[in-house]
Each structure stands twice: as C-alpha cells, then as structure tokens.
Amino acid sequence: MSVKGLNLSASAGKIPQTIGYYLAFIALGLSTASLGPTLPGLAEHTQTHLSQISFLFTARSLGYLFGSMLGGRLYDRVEGHPVMAATLILMAGMLILVPLMPLLGLLTLILLVLGMGEAAVDVGGNTLVVWVHRHQVGPFMNGLHFFFGVGSFLSPIIIAQAVLLSGDITWAYWMLAFLMLPMVAWLLRLPSPTSQADSRADPPGQVSHYPTSPLGSIGSEARQRLLVALIAFFLLLYVGAEVSFGGWIYTYALALGLSGATIAAYLTSAFWGALTLGRLLAIPIATRFRPRAILFGDLVGCLVSLSIILLWSKSLVAVWLGTFGMGLSVASIFPTTISLAERRMPITGRVTGWFFVGASAGGMTLPWVIGQLFESIGPRVTMFTIMADLIVAVGVFALLMRFSPEPAAP
C-alpha cells in the first residue's frame, strides 16, 4: 500500500527505530523547555539577578553550536544508537546537576555541556531518521519534530507540578532526568541504521536521485558545499525568527500595553501550541506536497501573520491571530528543509551538523539584536526585525530553488 509515493509496508519494518527517535525528541523537548520556567528558581539558588542568569541561554546556545559540529562527525564514524543513548545519559546527568549548582559560573558550565548534549541528540535524530526512511522521510521528519513539540509542551507542566508538590525546582529537574532513562533503554536494544555517506553513487543502471543544476559545471563537491551553505544560512534565518518571536512576544505585548502578564504568558503558550499543532498537521501534508511547495506556503504564512500584527499593532485580537498564524506557519519549516536537502544531496552526520551550526547561530544572534534595539527604538522593532529576517529568508529560498531544481519523484 502507498500514499502518494509513501510505501507504508516498507516503512512498517522501520517503526521501532522511528519510535526510538520520537522518544529521544520528547526527551529533547523536555530538556530544551526547562530553562525558561525555572529561571527565577535558578536565580534564587545562585543568589543572582535575572539579568545575570539570562546568560544561561547564551551558554546553552554556545554548547549547541559546539555539539552540532562535533556530533555530526561522530554519527558518521560510530554507530548512531549508542551515541544517541550516551548523549541522553549525559543530558540526564546535567539536568540532575543543574539545581545543585550554588554558583553562576558552575551553572553556566553545566548549561554549556547540556547544550552540547541536546545538539548531539538533535543532529542524531534528524540524521538517523533520514538514513532509515531515505527518500520517503518527509512525514516521518515532521513527526519527529512534532514529538519535540510534545516534550516542550509537557516540560513546563511537569515542572509546575513538581514545584507545587515539593516547593522547589530541584525535583522538577530530577523528574525530567529520570524520564530519559526508558528512552535510552529503547534505543540500545535496536540496531543502528546504515549511513547515507556511501549513497553518492547510484547503482549501475539507476538514474541519479540528485538533480543536475546550473552549478553542475563547477563540480558536484563545490555544488554540495554551496547548497549546504545556503541551507545552513536559511536555517539561521528561520531559527532566528522562531526563537525571537517565541522569546519576545511576551515582552512585546506587555511593553505595548496590550495585555497583562497572564494574557502575555498565554500568548507565548499559544505560539508554541500552534507550532506543535502545525507539526502534527504537517505529517499528512508532507505525503501530498513536495518540500518546496510546503516551504513556500510556510514563508507566505509567516509574512502574512507578521503583517497582521504590524498593521493592527494596537489590537490584541490581531496579535492573537498573528501569533497563532506564526506558530502554524513556522512549524514545518525545519523538518521540511531537511527533507528538501535530502532530495538534493546525500545527508551525512557532518552535513546535518553544519545545518545545526547555522540554526544555533540564528538562535543566538537575532534575539540578541532585538534585545539591543528594544528599549532604544521601541517594542515594534521586534516584529520589524523578524519581518526583515524572513524577507531575507525568502531570497535565500529563491536562490536554493534557482541553483538546485526539484528532482523527479522517486
């Protein structure tokens, strides 16, 4: 049985591995979303101010950058499942240590290492699911990122309940750490998939899956490097927009006097909730449409959503609509970009690592830029900056389509 090129019977035998990656991404979401709700508690533990402890976000992003570069190469050289299991254990260990650190310097080091572990799991999941499903990866990639959203959604709830029961954040972090252990056991019982590194050459008599392009004359290696650079830059712009919107919409609504603290918090939840819903909806969509069409629709949706917020900047209803639309629109950009890349080049751990270097750089830079401009120019600079970022992303997407045409459906 097949759905628009998706061979369901062939995919069924790969389900246990796919479940393992989905479980790992739930763990990744649990860890990633844990910092924000616990910042006040961590500030109390280290006897520092929020302005000082907010540097933990930068430390974790730096760890993500290093972990992306190192993790990608590691998956090309070592079996994937033991690597992913080891990094999940590393993450659990760091989560146990986080609430025990009395000094900000030590806590910063722990968050740096935690970021490296998170990046290794992120790179591994995105790489291994491609190696398992190859040219049919689209819906499974969207499913992977949906389960990251599930973990991100559950994390604040688990933290809130743990704090309610214990009165402190320590057990909140320990509960998140313990939840990762069953996921480690699941991965270790399954064989690792075969690397795609040797798939550059197609079998005799088979037409190459990877398309020719206007860059063909400069050689396949140079063409692939350019494509990797363009995709990494595109992901830099996308992640910068997503993290900036999710991180600043709360302060934006408060600063403009559109809402109080409670409604502003609900706005943030609405954005991440819409993003998770969008990733769920993207699973069937990926079986019917090609990645380039999905990405085009995503980018248009982002620009329309931001335009609604900017044109009716004094309307809370417009901000709600724009926030929900933005969450839905950005939801499938990352997994669809990886699916698009798989259609155009062999996906190795090293290639995926470079994609995450770009993504990590975006998560560090654009939110920081907005922070430097927010007070001096005003709250609306938030949406104007994200809009400019996404307009550049549209230009990079156009270059990708120009230099790497859509291959024929396999």
Over which residues does each language-model region extend?
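Intracellular juxtamembrane helix-capping segments at the cytosolic ends
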Residues: 120-133, 331-345
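C-terminal transmembrane helical hairpin of 12-TM major facilitator-type secondary transporters
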Residues: 289-337
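Helix-loop-helix hairpin linking two adjacent transmembrane segments in secondary transporters
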Residues: 135, 143-195
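Cytoplasmic helix-loop-helix junction between adjacent transmembrane helices
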Residues: 110-148
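Helix-to-loop junctions at the C-terminal end of transmembrane segments
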Residues: 67-79, 278-291, 374-375
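Conserved MFS/SLC helix-loop-helix module at the cytosolic interface between two early adjacent transmembrane helices
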Residues: 66-105
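Helix-breaking motifs and short loop linkers at transmembrane-helix boundaries and internal kinks
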Residues: 47, 79, 100-105, 134, ...
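Extracytoplasmic gate region of multi-pass secondary transporters
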Residues: 35-36, 224-269, 273-277
